[in-house]
Amino acid sequence: MHPNLVSWLGTLGFLLWALLCLGALTEGYPVKPENPGEDAPAEELAKYYSALRHYINLITRQRYGKRSSPEILDTLVSELLLKESTDQLPQSRYDPSLW
């Protein structure tokens, strides 16, 4: 085989692989509900608006990483805000002898 043909086949294979990976990623994304139309019955419109609200909640939800786990937040709050010892708190600059 010619080196040029092997290069083209490798490039084509990589592009096909990349398209397959992108296709797999898009399957996990929720599908927007279809609008039933203006003259649809009230029940269908209610179902549509419920599905639309669910869709919007899915695509706009906050995604938290490992740093935002509740255990770490509880630890930070207890360490930073709820300390009982005062030796690490900043001292006041108030000096009664100046007054």
Swiss-Prot record:
A GO CC annotation given for this chain: extracellular space
GO biological process: feeding behavior; negative regulation of adenylate cyclase-activating adrenergic receptor signaling pathway; neuropeptide signaling pathway; positive regulation of circadian sleep/wake cycle, sleep; positive regulation of feeding behavior
InterPro entries, per the entry: Pancreatic_hormone-like (IPR001955), Pancreatic_hormone-like_CS (IPR020392)
Domain of life: Eukaryota
Keywords carried by this UniProt record: Amidation, Cleavage on pair of basic residues, Neuropeptide, Secreted, Signal
Record-listed Tyrosine amide modification sites: Y64
Gene3D superfamilies according to UniProt: 6.10.250.900
Compartmental location: Secreted
Molecular function (Gene Ontology), one example: neuropeptide hormone activity
Pfam families associated with the record: Hormone_3
Signal sequence residues: 1-28
Function: NPY is implicated in the control of feeding and in secretion of gonadotrophin-release hormone.
Protein name in UniProt: Pro-neuropeptide Y
Organism: Dicentrarchus labrax
Gene: npy
